[in-house]
């Protein structure tokens, strides 16, 4: 028999969302007539907008012609999409991003998990707590985290608590981290950061030769003025930061799969001997070796997101979800819950009632209200006693779910 990668055995038992599915399945089998409302995993419910559908239909028709057929495309992405991303997502902010600095992929989850492959396995990793589990689990798999302790923390990770007391803004660590994961608007807390805070992170990264991995998958949900949409709004960030963006929640592409990662040419890593290496070139080598590119049809759909009509339709979808978020926030607040997020992000982070643990609160909502959310402890030890609800449900389901919860 071949030896296995034993780092996989260090993973916490059961990834968060499969564990939720398991509990819901058990309940459903015992209560087959129960109407369960799911406000847990962040999958969208609205259909793809017409502009995107039309573009994909036309692209599909092209594929059925001799002159319009596309086989393997450029792994980095078609130029028409790269240009749209550079012009609309960054040019509109006054940020110059070259097409060669953008890599189109099949999802931010994949990018966040794969990017660690280009860094040394002895790199010191810093994550917020609570945190999107993929950041931690992929580094566990790579062998960077050490063993898990009785408190649920891995011995070789730097945890940066994001709590009510610090406004869910993780404090900059006193020790040196090689890789720092940041996510804004934040999953799971639904909170945002400030430009001043990002400046401090960029300064820290420069001082410590660190790389910031900036997950901005929910940028399109920002509604308040002054909230930074990209870390590259901060001067010097191109020298220290990689940014992740996605069409999944912005345009409902969870079933189509399209995202992108930005790695500026200025960004460097180093070898053990101290030689500088372009991270853009390194990722390009990895990307073209392990990935054949997103389909032509999907990329034409993504391009349509940037058309005037596409933007208008997508904003209507985003407004629908954020109206759900407001309903959740307002309903829970009226019922006496302590609530965070849900203003610039589609997630609401709430304190559990009666000092229940996160999983006990999950079971309470499932068994008494038939509502499914996400236990905060699944995002890290600092998430214990909290709970995440998603605004991606249907309007009528959200309204019924809040009515059920507030009647408990």
Swiss-Prot record:
The keyword Transferase applies. Gene3D superfamilies: Aspartate Aminotransferase, domain 1, Type I PLP-dependent aspartate aminotransferase-like (Major domain). It catalyses: (2S,6S)-2,6-diaminopimelate + 2-oxoglutarate = (S)-2,3,4,5-tetrahydrodipicolinate + L-glutamate + H2O + H(+). GO terms for biological process: lysine biosynthetic process via diaminopimelate, diaminopimelate-aminotransferase pathway. Substrate binds at residues 15, 42, 109, 132, 187, 292, 388. CDD domains: AAT_like. Its cofactor is pyridoxal 5'-phosphate. It holds the Pfam family Aminotran_1_2. The keyword Transferase applies. Keywords: Aminotransferase, Pyridoxal phosphate, Transferase. One of its GO terms (molecular function) is L,L-diaminopimelate aminotransferase activity. It comes from the Bacteria. Pyridoxal 5'-phosphate binds at residues 72, 108-109, 132, 187, 218, 246-248, 257, 292. The modification N6-(pyridoxal phosphate)lysine is found at residue 249. Its EC number is 2.6.1.83. It is an enzyme of class 2 (transferase). Pathway: Amino-acid biosynthesis; L-lysine biosynthesis via DAP pathway; LL-2,6-diaminopimelate from (S)-tetrahydrodipicolinate (aminotransferase route): step 1/1. Involved in the synthesis of meso-diaminopimelate (m-DAP or DL-DAP), required for both lysine and peptidoglycan biosynthesis. Catalyzes the direct conversion of tetrahydrodipicolinate to LL-diaminopimelate. Homodimer. Belongs to the class-I pyridoxal-phosphate-dependent aminotransferase family. LL-diaminopimelate aminotransferase subfamily. This is LL-diaminopimelate aminotransferase. It comes from Leptospira interrogans serogroup Icterohaemorrhagiae serovar Lai (strain 56601). The gene is dapL.
């Amino acid at each position: 028999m071949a030896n296995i990668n034993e780092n996989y055995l260090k993973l916490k038992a059961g990834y968060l969302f499969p564990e939720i599915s398991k509990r819901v399945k058990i309940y459903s089998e015992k209560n087959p007539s129960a109407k369960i409302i799911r406000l847990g995993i962040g999958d969208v419910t609205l259909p793809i907008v017409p502009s995107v559908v039309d573009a994909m239909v036309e692209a599909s028709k092209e594929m059925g012609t001799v002159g319009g057929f596309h086989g393997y495309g450029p792994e980095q992405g078609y130029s028409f999409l790269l240009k749209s991303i550079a012009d609309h997502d960054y040019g509109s902010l006054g940020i110059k991003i070259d097409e060669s600095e953008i890599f189109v992929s099949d999802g931010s989850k994949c990018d966040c998990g794969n990017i660690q492959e280009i860094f040394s396995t002895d790199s010191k990793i810093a994550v917020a707590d609570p945190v999107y589990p993929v950041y931690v689990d992929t580094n566990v798999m790579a062998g960077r985290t050490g063993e898990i302790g009785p408190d649920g923390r891995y011995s070789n990770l730097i945890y940066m608590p994001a709590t009510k007391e610090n406004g869910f803004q993780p404090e900059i660590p006193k020790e040196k981290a090689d890789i720092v994961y940041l996510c804004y608007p934040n999953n799971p807390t639904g909170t945002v950061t400030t430009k001043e805070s990002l400046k401090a992170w960029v300064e820290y990264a420069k001082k410590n030769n660190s790389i910031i991995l900036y997950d901005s998958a929910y940028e399109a949900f920002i509604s308040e003025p002054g909230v930074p949409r990209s870390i590259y709004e901060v001067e010097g960030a191109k020298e220290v930061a990689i940014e992740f963006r996605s069409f999944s929640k912005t345009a409902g592409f969870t079933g189509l799969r399209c995202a992108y990662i930005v790695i500026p040419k200025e960004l460097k890593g180093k070898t053990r001997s101290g030689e500088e290496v372009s991270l853009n070139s390194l990722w390009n080598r990895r990307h073209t070796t392990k990935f054949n590119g997103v389909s032509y049809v999907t990329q034409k759909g993504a391009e349509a997101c940037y058309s005037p009509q596409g933007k208008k339709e997508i904003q209507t979808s985003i407004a629908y979800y954020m109206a759900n978020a407001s309903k959740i926030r307002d309903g829970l607040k009226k019922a006496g819950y302590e609530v965070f997020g849900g203003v610039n992000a589609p997630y609401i982070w709430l304190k559990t009632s009666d000092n229940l643990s996160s999983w006990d609160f999950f079971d309470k909502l499932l068994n008494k209200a038939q509502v499914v959310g996400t236990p905060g402890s699944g995002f890290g030890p600092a998430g214990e006693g909290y709970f995440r609800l998603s605004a991606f449900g249907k309007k009528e389901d959200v309204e019924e779910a809040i009515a059920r919860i507030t009647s408990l």
